[in-house]
Amino acid sequence: MVQSQSLSTLTICGSVKVSSLLRNRLNSVKASSLIGDRCVSCQFLRKSPSFRSHWKSLKQRNLLRVEARWPFQGGGEQGLDPSSERSESANEDILIFFFQLDLATRVQYAMNLEQYDIAQQLREKLTEVEEESIRLQEGKRGSSAKSEAQDKGISIIRLRADLQNAIDSEDYGLAAKLRDEISKLEAESLAVSAKALAFEKAEYAFRLGQKLRHKTFGYRAVVCGMDPICSESSSWMEAAEVEKLPRGSNQPFYQVLVDVRTHPDLLVAYVAEDNLLAPEKPDKERFDHPYISFLYYGADTAGDFIPVKQLREKYNRPRHEVPFDSQDED
């Protein structure tokens, strides 16, 4: 199956561009020749012939049924197709997460071999990647907006003090300018605070590991990440026609893995909550994707996938417990 492939095959599927951050980390670790050819840096981007062969057969098999996949295929009057929601940034985010997991494993491996110098070098690389990952996640979660709101609040306090001094000295021209600046900053602060609050109070209809179906394109998908609002660029949102959605960009967006048997050329999609639908009955059908075994422990009794602990911690999501049903024992 696809998910049995090694980590070294992950970046060859489709036209995946690895971020400059990840590429720099890989090259840096590789230059150190850490732990020989067992280190991820020496094989992370190495292509697997057996995987390419399997991937080619998957694509050929699906070419025969691409037109009959879903009655709403093609996006209706919009003329969109699934590739409009392709997200290289989401895929890169996942690859960085893989790199974190692998570096942590290599640190432990070096410690077990009592190669402490190597372990220290790996730990330093891991710390760099973790710090960058945290910074990116905080930006998505609104931490930067909250900080910006606080900065504007401090500026307003200072301007009010200047305003009072201008009034006391009867410099009414300066006072008028300061009053206008304060009004402008207050409006900006209110908007930024509202954005930060939206991030903090975000509610998600779907959870990590849940199997879903795209409302328009019909493909099956599994949630592997989530943002309170759309974090993609304005050009991406324009191409995906996000503004035509009922809630636009101000709604949760999900990183989803797409079943390669349905769309072998679309690994990761970035989809609005409005465009996703949970199945009425448990989906226990086979789901193929090269990232599955790295992001999930396996499937639960309802057919959804169980995210690894590190993935839950990344998005600060609780562990999902499948409700007990006595009929399952029959």
UniProtKB/Swiss-Prot annotation:
Role played: Clp protease adapter that facilitates CLPS1 recruitment to ClpC chaperones thus forming a binary adapter for selective substrate recognition and delivery to plastid Clp protease system (CLPC).
Molecular function via GO: DNA binding
Region (YccV-like): 203-310
Location of the protein in the cell: Plastid, Chloroplast
The protein, known as: Clp protease adapter protein ClpF, chloroplastic
Segments forming a coiled coil: 112-139, 175-195
Record InterPro entries: Clp_protease_adapter_ClpF (IPR053189), Hemimethylated_DNA-bd_dom (IPR011722), Hemimethylated_DNA-bd_sf (IPR036623), UVR_dom (IPR001943)
Subunit: Binds to CLPC1 and CLPC2. Interacts with ClpS1; this interaction stimulates their association with ClpC. Associates with the Clp substrate HEMA1 (GluTR).
This protein's UniProt keywords: Chloroplast, Coiled coil, Plastid, Transit peptide
Residue ranges of domain UVR in the record: 153-188
A GO CC annotation given for this chain: chloroplast
Effect of a null allele: Reduction by 10 precent of total chlorophyll, with slight increase of chlorophyll a/b ratio and slight decrease of chlorophyll-to-carotenoid ratios. Overaccumulation of ClpS1 protein.
Expressed in which tissues: Expressed constitutively in photosynthetic tissues such as leaves, stems and flowers, and, at low levels, in siliques.
Lineage: Eukaryota, Viridiplantae, Streptophyta, Embryophyta, Tracheophyta
